[in-house]
Amino acid sequence: MSHKILLVNGPNLNLLGRREPSVYGHQTLADIVAELNQQAKLAEVELEHIQSNAEFELINAIHATDAQMIIINPAAFTHTSVALRDALLGVAIPFFEVHLSNVHAREAFRHHSYFSDKAIGVICGFGSQGYEFALAAAIKRLNQPL
């Protein structure tokens, strides 16, 4: 496998399947990652995954990765984390921002993102399928000739 994508999931996403299923769906994070691993394997791309409720662990994973692309669901850090934004900008790895719910149809504080203006694209409101869309787009970009 010549390409690698880092999948970053932020706080509380470890509770998927149990936390507000009417908003976030019934799939667990493990289910979602398993499906993405199959999609990546078919495309002969390596998918590395981290989920953490600790901002510094996500930052350290971004600093340490040798991936050529990042897919990130910053979760609640979307609206608060300049540090995570700076980590992404510091490594200069292109990234897609994903959200399970349509953040623009929710509370006003969820409308602001510290990431959207720097992301290749933002996918929200499609549930777990949003990750599949982001992975397909990332794979397509990685396979485009320079």
Curated annotation (Swiss-Prot):
It catalyses: 3-dehydroquinate = 3-dehydroshikimate + H2O. Catalyzes a trans-dehydration via an enolate intermediate. Pfam families: DHquinase_II. The active site is at Y24, H99. One of its GO terms (molecular function) is 3-dehydroquinate dehydratase activity. SUPFAM superfamilies: Type II 3-dehydroquinate dehydratase. This is 3-dehydroquinate dehydratase. It is an enzyme of class 4 (lyase). It comes from Shewanella baltica (strain OS195). Pathway: Metabolic intermediate biosynthesis; chorismate biosynthesis; chorismate from D-erythrose 4-phosphate and phosphoenolpyruvate: step 3/7. The gene is aroQ. Belongs to the type-II 3-dehydroquinase family. Substrate binds at N73, H79, D86, L100, S101, R110.
